[in-house]
């Protein structure tokens, strides 16, 4: 699926936003599908995976996702930087150090999984250090238009408040493809981020994969976890487009 050519994208309908937290609670309670998935998902090779949380969330929010990946034999790690309050003057340096230290410790490339705003960070890390990144997976990340969310006013990097020229430059920069194998996971029923703002320009080693879940539930929804497990299991140099398992 190719992304739209629109310059701006509106947030999701209010009807989805109102239902968001209730849907996420139900998705978290559905333990059965996640347990079943552990029996069928491809096993990992033990390589390191950094998981970056969304806005106003921290490592606590990614425990289910990291626990799932560890059960598949990955060395899944949180970012260890507390609550994600948005970009700060020191955050980029801390993230650079985290990635490079992890790469050096394991002596192998690192996969990045970023949820929502965490996916923006992950994309910029991969852009800056492509030789240290094995693959990039984003969950409900609005890199095509950071303002296409119901929390955009909380994010300092939003285009709003800038001149039209500066806002256009920021959007154009964030949506530029990253030079590593990239999978963008999106949901058309996302109540926080408009799904069209998550669409990658498809091309070699770039893809969009649709799931059916809430934004807040992406990190523990079985369908999302299945995609993440499949993408991480690909051998280096043998990337292929996602094909849903029977």
Could you describe each region identified by the protein language model?
Residues 40-41, 173-176, 198-201:
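Short secondary-structure boundary/capping segments
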Residues 179-246:
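C-terminal catalytic-base region of ester-bond hydrolases, centering on the histidine
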């Amino acid at each position: 699926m190719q992304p739209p050519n629109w310059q701006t994208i509106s947030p999701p309908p209010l009807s989805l936003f109102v239902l968001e937290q209730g849907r996420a609670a139900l998705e978290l309670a559905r333990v059965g599908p996640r347990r079943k998935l552990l029996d069928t998902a491809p096993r990992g090779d033990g390589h390191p995976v950094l998981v970056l949380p969304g806005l106003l969330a921290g490592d606590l929010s990614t425990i289910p996702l990291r626990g799932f990946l560890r059960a598949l034999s990955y060395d899944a790690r949180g970012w260890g930087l507390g609550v994600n309050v948005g970009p700060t003057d020191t955050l980029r340096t801390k993230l650079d150090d985290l990635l490079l230290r992890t790469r050096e410790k394991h002596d192998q490339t690192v996969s990045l999984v970023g949820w929502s705003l965490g996916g923006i960070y992950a994309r910029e890390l991969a852009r800056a250090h492509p030789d240290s990144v094995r693959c990039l997976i984003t969950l409900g990340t609005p890199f095509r238009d950071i303002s296409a969310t119901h929390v955009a006013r909380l994010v300092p990097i939003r285009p709003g408040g800038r001149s039209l020229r500066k806002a256009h430059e920021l959007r154009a920069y964030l949506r530029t493809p990253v030079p590593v194998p990239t999978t963008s996971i999106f949901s058309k029923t996302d109540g926080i981020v408009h799904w069209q703002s998550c669409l990658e320009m498809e091309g070699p080693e770039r893809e969009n994969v649709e799931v059916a879940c809430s934004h807040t539930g992406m990190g523990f929804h079985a369908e999302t976890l299945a995609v993440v497990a499949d993408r991480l299991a690909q051998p280096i140099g043998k990337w292929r487009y996602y094909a849903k398992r029977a």
